[in-house]
Amino acid sequence: MTIPCSRPLFIEPFDLYLFGMGRHRHLYRILGAHPAVQDGEAGYRFAVWAPNARSVHLSGDCNGWRHEGCPLFPVGVSGVWAAFVPGVRRGSLYKFVVRGADGRQEQKADPFALWAEMRPGVASVAWDIDNHAWGDGAWMAERARQGLPLERPVSIYEVHLGSWRRRHGDGHPFLTYDELGDQLIPYATGMGFTHLELLPVAEHPLDQSWGYQTGHYYAPTSRFGSPEGFKRFVDRCHQAGLGVILDWVPAHFPRDAWSLGRFDGTALYEHLDPRLGEHPDWGTYIFNYGRNEVRNFLTANALYWLREFHIDGLRMDAVASMLYLDYSREAGQWLPNRHGGRENLDAVDFLREVNTVIHAEFPGAMTLAEESTAWPGVSRPVYTGGLGFSFKWNMGWMHDTLGYLAEDPIHRAYHHGSLTFSMLYAFSENFVLPLSHDEVVHGKGALLSKMPGDMWQQQANLRLLYAYQWAHPGKKLLFMGGEFGQWNEWDESRELDWCLYRFPAHEGIARLVGDLNRLLRSEPAMHRRDHDWSGFRWVDFADYGSSVISFLRLAEGERPLLWIFNFTPVVRRFYRVPCPRGGTWRELCNTDSAYYGGSDVGNAGAVMAREDHWGGGHFIELTLPPLAAMCFAPVTGQGT
């Protein structure tokens, strides 16, 4: 084997200056491995940031995995080591051999690798960026023109690509990106969802982490194919009218010796003090957000997914753990900030910066925060003191609603406040209502199995939950399997229980979710004013004795929608509900319809509003089905 001779590599001083300032928005094109030609020879240029290393060498296919003989050279005092290596080909495996400041030699993956080998291997793969001809120009232009979808329907189907469907019998369990495109895209669009949210696709060594312990931040996982395969998948989603959101993990990273931790023999990407640099729950390192180069690594990574893969949004995981220095720590296990407080000021600055940059460079791209505390202004603009996210997950709504529905209906009257409390803060943020993967793992059971009663009541409760979620102000998110009433808790090692579609009750649940999505899209009152009081009005929230609530969804210049919910298995006849106008009100949705697997109690498709001669206004008198929700709209041209 001919061992290539590495050569010094010139990097523009301005690129290094921007990196040192934490401001290089295309940093992934400077660091990492990229095809190049030098003196007529084709190869790859390599660059890595390791300011405290004693030496850095390239080891890989190109030199028989020798640890010496192919050195990288320091680029001034920037802390960057770089070299051009002739003869390296696309697809070659490589690692950096870093002799750290502590004298120890470690084989490290490239932090900016564009692809990585399939687990259990952790080597980086020499690849390129510009490898796909995009066909989604119309989608991208329209996204930029319309801006954030605050007043448009958003219904997100959360998916773990490795367990949505699986292959059987050929030894490789995962579908490819192209196979996922063939199956997942038509399924999601057929169900009426507007977006997919993918659990992290950045390469990760452990399946059981679901991608939340990221090993290669710039490399789409090889489980499903190549980086251009993932680009084809996103392209096909856009051409089918489906947005793509990625889960992104800037909160922490794994401690594996080959990864970012102690990269040059020092705490480079993390804090040295474990009270700042180690997460006690997950056994991971926490990024040092106060270091310019680390902030740049993360900010450029966010821009990389948006720019190079045309991603429509990033959902940032575990934001609460970033915001608080004492998160999950006892007294004496954390260090206060410079003002003596518990807020992680560096993390706050980072979140504001990354949100500002994303919204400036990619109008219409969303950022979503999984944030479970009462931190104010998470989804408010940075210039008003907020963190700058587009949306925040409403964890309080999720917790209270699931807790309420887990109660036996006979006890729900005593927990009525759990159902109505969310409206006290529903417009304090731009909320997404999440029924996510976190609610169907670790012994929590599937959504269907959380519901009380016999099988029929469980299914009716689930249909009622979905109608309440879709009717409630806020954007919608549902984890895969929930749409057809998966019985079993989610297991990342096996596919969903698709066999349940053979049962009419489960098919009925899926029909309901599809119809709720179509109602969300077609009725402006269901989505246009999701984030302020003008889109919602209580009709009756106080009938706790019957466990019945009713409210209006509103949009200026559009017909109102009247939603009524009966959270008991009791059929309530001659039930009066006030309404804002007279005439005929047509039924748009009844979750007790036999079409959805219900008992088919209803009102023959419409009710007539009558004048209330005593209290003024109008009312309808109707039959409320058991454990069901109903939606009515006035027939246009009638009433006053």
Curated annotation (Swiss-Prot):
Q: Has keyword DNA repair?
A: no
GO CC terms of this entry: cytosol
Q: Name one GO molecular function term.
A: 1,4-alpha-glucan branching enzyme activity
In terms of SUPFAM superfamilies, this protein maps to: (Trans)glycosidases, E set domains, Glycosyl hydrolase domain
Q: Catalytic residues? A: 317, 370
Q: Does the keyword Ribonucleoprotein apply?
A: no
Oligomer and partners: Monomer.
Q: What is this protein called?
A: 1,4-alpha-glucan branching enzyme GlgB
The species this protein was found in = Nitratidesulfovibrio vulgaris (strain DP4)
